[in-house]
């Protein structure tokens, strides 16, 4: 089995695990079918019995996509919550790497740099219109879950992280560039140390209410005050499965 086939098989195994995690025993027949087809393909690949590897692999991919599309149409509210909170869910770094043409992560000063749950980056969007090339710098601010990384606290930001977000909103206003915020949080981190979680969220809201640059927010998981801290925007968007 070549490395490319092995990589794709690992991806299919991850997708099957994801389906099991989301539906928790429901749709057992569909899950069993996917498992059987995946095991059959793996066995043939290991024994070198694939007559047309590309065609058979594409057929297996199509089967996975068909089952996933069918299951997605019957999602319950709790299943949507599991999707939003799953470690394989897209995170802010994935967006930075795949949506923006270039980005540089920046940190705060002193205690404002202590919270890895809040990610700030200067990013660039490049678009072509006819023969002209347009470059737009933006300030990207959002909670980072890191696909379940424990040190990210599940996207629950402490007051220092929200203070860092507020600081760079002001920087964006000074430079006259738009602010893009991404909300991936179940809520603010429950802590009452100075400057206080609720007090810092209030400062952020006050700051955003007066910003003189456009603010666009994209919501995946918008829980409680953690979402409010960076969610006051001129335009709000939500992912197809989000709340």
Regions from the language model: what does each represent?
Residues 1-217, 221-228, 232-237, 241-243:
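Terminal-region recognition feature
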